[in-house]
Amino acid sequence: MKYTLFTLFFSICICNAQAQIVSIPDLNFKNALLNDSSVNTNFDNEIQVSEAQAALDLLFYYEDISDFTGLEAFVNLQTLAIEGELITSIDLSANLEVTNLSIVVTPITNLDLSSNSQLESLTLVANELTTLDLSTNLQLEYIYFLNNPLTDLNLGANIVLEELIVSSNVILPTIDVSENTSLKKIEVVNNSMTSFDVSNNINLEILRTYGNNLLTLDVSTNLMLKELNTMFNQLSSLDLSANTALDWFNARNNQLQTLDARNGNNDLFINFNVINNPDLQCILVDDPTANYLTSWNVDQNTLFGNSNQDCQSLVVDQNEIYAPHLYPNPALETLFIEAKKPMLEFCIYTTTGAIFMQDKPSQPSFFYQIDVSTLPSGVYYIKVVGSTFRSIKRIVKY
């Protein structure tokens, strides 16, 4: 009788011990946990449920893990960072306490975060995600998405979001941040976006939109803005006059024709860069005679004025001084152009504004000739762009 009772008691103990061990079928996942002394606290060859429940942070870095079954036992997990693993999906439905999640360089195609309502920080880099539902993640404060083929991103529910970084997601035409009024930093770069509206983001301090195809950008309501980096876009006009806190600005390599920088604090700029905007002839500034303007990075032929009238007068004066001489005019076969400053390019327009011919010397030149023999007879305009001038002249073709 004693032997029978002992056998029964021993069998129950074995079953109970087995029941307290987390089932982890992926050996690489299991080995990573066993080698983590903060998880495998008794240094045996299994992960007990009690050990899983005690773990708050897990980091996996190129462990060749393809299956995270067993992660559901880590019910108190707060931080999960995965990089370079082989997963295409992951089940986080039992990890209700996760506040920080990072998944980097994986082939994951599906990510369900509907159960993770405590999530505050989300980093997704170089994955295969095309869609992502964040409608239940109301506590999100930080989002960093880099190089994911997302076709849409709905942030309407994430109203406490303070920092948004979305980079190299080239399929996104735009991102709606109209509901995210708590945002202090937005970095949406290299996404090929054609439009971006930040008019509701009144708490914004840092805005980076470089490397897109933006045609317009209105920052008139972003009164707390300190940094604006919108280089390498297609912007033709910018108005910074309302941005009195702005002290860092880069809009190089755009198509700027007008720029109003009269924000009342031009002397506070630690960076001001608008080079490679060949059509920007004059910038509106607080004081066109101020010494600090010499530290601004502008094209050689760009001038400074305090009013539109100033700029118009300066541009006319500058262009008249270096205006090229064209002859013969009318022309039959060849048009000769001479200038006091090096010429860079030429463009002939019809009277309706259509471009008929473009030409460019192999190097900056004081003298150039254009073959106009193929031009139909009539009146045209020729724009001559030089190193320090831009001139439009009327020509007649016989």
Predicted regions and their residues:
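LRR N-terminal entry segment and analogous cap-like coil->beta motifs
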Residues: 41, 46-90, 97-98
